[in-house]
């Protein structure tokens, strides 16, 4: 250590306090990285890795660096790679410091704590989430978006429900107790853990006394109950870990975290991880894209905060009928008033992301352009309020009352900040003329400088008679008078020599020196004063953060309502009836996304009736590609849309509010967790049977297909019986299957109905009619579907042959079908039932073929039938 330079010793001391972060160490105009940080960062950032001496034992020290004024994109790239970055600044002026400059970490940027807009997706939250297992079956979940100040907590029962909240929040970073490090990956969902940064917090942070003290101190309350968080012990422990982490990384600059909202999952329609994925609520299954999801369809929002609010509504549909109807009323009024919708959109399109502007202003990381954007946004509010004054629905009226134009804030910014300020704060040009008297005076001095120099130069030329005399400036000598050597004899006595050149000499005069001190001092003072004034304005705006947050939330809500109204009007959706009953009735329902994407083909609508009586469980049979999965997803999506307050794609709908939607649709191996397709399927089915209630909606597609036929039929049959017979989980259920044996359940169970997807056979082809009709399907048409998929003709013909053998019902020991392995017999071209007689029955055949059936009387027909009977 003694061989290290003082600077490297300082670096290593600071680095020791931040071992899990890449340390950006400020050296002049650069952030430097050393040792392992340099090696890692140079690889991620694709920048040059170099080295220099004076490391331990005299070894070379790997290093790389980036300019401090353009560090943001480099930091963003490291964060995107899952790294944390500790920003270490010089906290002393090198000009006035002897020895090593004092440095300290001013903040740590982590994947879950990003505030720079360039690194954030506009219409998605960037959550830091905290999980805490109370070891009593209850899990605390808390999550924060530092860029907006949104901070929420809840408690759930069990591991699966906790990870369901993780799936909903979709955090970039997850905090867990350090003692949970070893089993975090095993206990967690592999697919949910992928791509997220895990941070392990010291166990003592979760101590309940410390938790309560931290919560009370931050929010300035006497007890957590003042925040509405009574009865959330584990949730508060999770939230305290977030606050502790903020203190460690943000160095206390989190004043904009002013509210902690507790919620019960029972207040919303519960959607587990599998259901969110299978229904493609916010991203498609195949590509993970927004387009093709329900969010992609419904999002017509004009603001980023509106887009985030819509995502929240989709993730948390309502279960309280009055609140749903309140939203429906507002959507209906907007849908029926195109002029009002257009006016709202025009106003909102000029509104910036107020939530994130508020966050940056409160964190003192905003620039002058952020304040100008805030002013422009606030100026859009008065005309918007004029539009809303005439609205008649309760929710729109509440929004109108709650949106604050904050006139004095807009006036302060307009008076204090120029309309087009520079990006860099410390270069001046930010504060408007007329805002501050001293600044105006200093600017006058600076602006008059050129005129003063020109006048002084003319005066000196006249006084000395030296026509070639020049007054110039450089950074080393400041202002000076330059005289050629041929004119040195004409210089006055008050000229003071400053520099001798080959062909000239440079001088100053007392008058020029006095001007220099005044002008240069003025320019330095201008920059210093402007920055100070800007900070004062920013602090004044930050003090109104709560008002701004409330206004932003109401504008976001208005934006979502207008977006839903746009879609409802354009796509001819209906307002569904909502009640607390048990009936789910949809007339001519359509799949919202499929209908919108396939504009060239008319979507075939379908009806559905489910209740807790004789229509509790509907078994749906029919071939692949016929539309079973689309139909079932469409029912689930219509229910979800109705409960988030949207209109729905149907001619009429009545929705008895459901408490949960479960889907078991499709499957794939989860290699990260060592689980097969069948295991994933069975785990999801088990979760449904454990958690479903009579108020739930269950969608099951092809239960049991991941194992042998007999096992699959048995499991599917037993699951259907359980959902029917067990009162605790007798949910309204759509059950699609290829096992036609299950249609027999409608005979033995009073609340089971059979439906199938209609098809039409024509010229050995199958035509899918996409219509759900009563009754079970008679065929699966799998071979026809295989032909449509392009399987080789040899495979198709062999499949027909095997199917023919299987339909004979021949099985070997153990239930395995007997399939001929010898020379292939040609697959029959027609069903064997079409030939009623053997070829040797010539007399019988001749008698039948000679009959003119159309000419027979009933009596003649009976006599001939008796004759034929005697011939057999």
From Swiss-Prot:
CDD domains: ABC_MutS1
Keywords: ATP-binding, DNA damage, DNA repair, DNA-binding, Nucleotide-binding
Pfam families membership: MutS_I, MutS_II, MutS_III, MutS_IV, MutS_V
Signal peptide: none
Binding positions for ATP per the UniProt entry: 622-629
One BP term from GO: mismatch repair
Family: Belongs to the DNA mismatch repair MutS family.
Name of the protein in question: DNA mismatch repair protein MutS
